[in-house]
Amino acid sequence: MRTLVILAAILLVALQAQAEPLQARTDEATAAQEQIPTDNPEVVVSLAWDESLAPKDSVPGLRKNMACYCRIPACLAGERRYGTCFYRRRVWAFCC
């Protein structure tokens, strides 16, 4: 019985440790969405991506000619997700 309680406590600590970074990302996304003006007729697009996923310059000219789009619900075949777009209070996939 005591072993079961200890294992449950360890599991809860591990889950809480994993949930904290996710909460920080959620807070950043919420803050980005709150900054979007609703009365402005211009289109406002907010992009967020992970720099570690960005394509490297190992192939010359790759980044110059690469086309990226914000898509819902996911990237098309042959594209890779590099981050998130926030547009009109919706979350889109940033695909290249």
UniProtKB/Swiss-Prot annotation:
Key word DNA-binding present: no
InterPro entries: Alpha-defensin, Alpha-defensin_C, Alpha-defensin_N, Beta/alpha-defensin_C
Location of this chain's protein in the cell: Secreted
Domain of life (superkingdom): Eukaryota
GO cellular component, one term: extracellular space
Pfam families: Defensin_1, Defensin_propep
Disulfide topology: 68-96, 70-85, 75-95
Stated role: Has bacteriostatic activity against Gram-positive bacteria S.aureus and L.monocytogenes and Gram-negative bacterium E.coli and antifungal activity against C.neoformans.
PANTHER family xrefs: ALPHA-DEFENSIN 1, NEUTROPHIL DEFENSIN 1-RELATED
The protein, known as: Neutrophil defensin 3
